[in-house]
């Protein structure tokens, strides 16, 4: 029985991926490694913790000794690396933490994986490394990396390290770059769960600038299936873009949330735009579609409706994660000199 290490597996995307692997691959064991920082939550794995094919280890990917011990403990043959600081707003407030976790942590993991003889390493990255697009076109795997934020810069640097380890040491590495995710268990600092939570509580919905920034949205279940497809069939040394084909302006998304919840658009509050805010992202996913036969299956309208229902059904989960640290960040970011427009 082969073992896959999923770093950041108690987070939003990671927990959805862990559940998929356990459901789809009965001969695979999953070891989840997660520090359980503010966005990591064991409750996200509540259906996995009792599975005999799943183990959980709490630890920091920057801790070389701990990472080496984990890789030496379970005959791990494959790694899907999701552990990261991932919120752009937080990276503006504290860039150093993003460099430490996203860059140094990736290097630590690569070094330990190489020494342990790990057969395959999948780096989970983001479309944000490509920077911003005009109104036309889309990012391909050959697009230059032009990150705009400390977050995207840290992910681009990590991607370069992954590629360098592949070229220098012959490691079997792959990189995925995905568009904006949404779905169950997403921490409420991100756009869709933030808007859902505020709308449910009749609080203002803060929208940056004119709200016409465009993002391509993909349901987390589609992203998870793409990651598994890359792990199993991707060509070593390659990059695979993953998009949902659902381009929407932020304002369109916010209005859809309000409409589905039966709330008035008067709750929308335009605030000062975020520094370095990219105007548009769009992904060309033809490579993964042609090579691996993957297709996004969830239509945005249905996925958003299902996501809202999940948050309504799991209001206790939402309240439990949106506690002290989150409230401190929310207050500092949305009240710290940012004004409604």
Predicted feature descriptions by range:
Residues 157, 161, 165, 195, ...:
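Hydrophobic alpha-helix immediately C-terminal to the catalytic Tyr-X-X-X-Lys motif of short-chain
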Residues 147-154, 184, 188-192, 216-220:
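The catalytic Tyr-centered alpha-helix of NAD(P)H-dependent dehydrogenases
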Residues 1-181, 306, 311-314, 320-341:
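N-terminal Rossmann-like NAD(P)+-binding domain of SDR-like oxidoreductases, especially those catalyzing
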Residues 5, 18, 30, 59, ...:
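C-terminal substrate-binding subdomain of Rossmann-fold SDR/epimerase-dehydratase oxidoreductases
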Residues 122, 131-135, 170, 186, ...:
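Proline-centered turn/helix-capping motifs that create local helix->coil transitions or kinks
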Residues 13, 39-40, 65, 186, ...:
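Residues that form or flank phosphate/diphosphate-binding pockets in enzymes
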Residues 48, 137, 188-196:
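A glycine/serine/threonine-rich, flexible loop-to-helix segment
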Residues 66, 97, 104, 187-191, ...:
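Residue-level recognition of oxygen-bearing side chains
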């Amino acid at each position: 029985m082969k073992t896959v290490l999923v770093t950041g597996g108690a987070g939003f995307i990671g927990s959805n991926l862990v559940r998929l692997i356990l459901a789809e691959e009965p001969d695979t064991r999953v070891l989840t490694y997660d520090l359980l920082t503010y966005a990591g939550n064991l409750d996200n794995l509540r259906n996995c913790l009792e599975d005999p094919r799943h183990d959980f280890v709490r630890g920091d990917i920057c801790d070389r000794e701990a990472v080496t011990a984990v890789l030496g403990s379970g005959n791990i043959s494959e790694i899907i690396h999701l552990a990261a600081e991932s919120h752009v707003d937080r990276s503006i407030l504290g860039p150093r933490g993003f460099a430490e976790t996203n860059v140094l942590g990736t290097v630590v993991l690569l070094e330990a994986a190489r020494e342990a003889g790990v057969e395959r390493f999948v780096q989970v990255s983001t479309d944000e490394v490509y920077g911003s697009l005009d109104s036309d076109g889309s990012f391909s795997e050959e697009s230059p990396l032009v990150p705009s934020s400390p977050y995207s810069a840290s992910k681009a640097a990590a991607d370069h390290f992954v590629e360098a380890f592949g070229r220098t040491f012959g490691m079997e590495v792959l990189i995925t770059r995905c568009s904006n995710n949404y779905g169950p268990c997403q921490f409420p600092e991100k756009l869709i769960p933030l808007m859902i939570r505020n709308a449910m509580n009749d609080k203002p919905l803060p929208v940056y600038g004119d709200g016409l920034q465009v993002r391509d949205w993909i349901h987390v279940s589609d992203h998870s299936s793409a990651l598994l497809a890359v792990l199993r069939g991707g060509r070593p040394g390659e990059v695979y873009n993953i998009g949902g084909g659902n381009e929407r302006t932020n304002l369109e998304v916010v209005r859809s949330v309000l409409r589905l919840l039966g709330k008035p658009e008067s709750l929308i509050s335009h605030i000062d735009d975020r520094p370095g805010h990219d105007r548009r992202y769009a992904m060309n996913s033809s490579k993964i579609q042609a090579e691996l036969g993957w297709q996004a299956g969830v239509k945005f309208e249905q996925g958003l409706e299902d996501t809202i229902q999940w948050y309504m059904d799991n209001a206790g989960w939402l309240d439990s994660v949106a506690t002290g640290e989150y409230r401190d960040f929310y207050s500092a970011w949305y009240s710290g000199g940012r004004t409604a427009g």
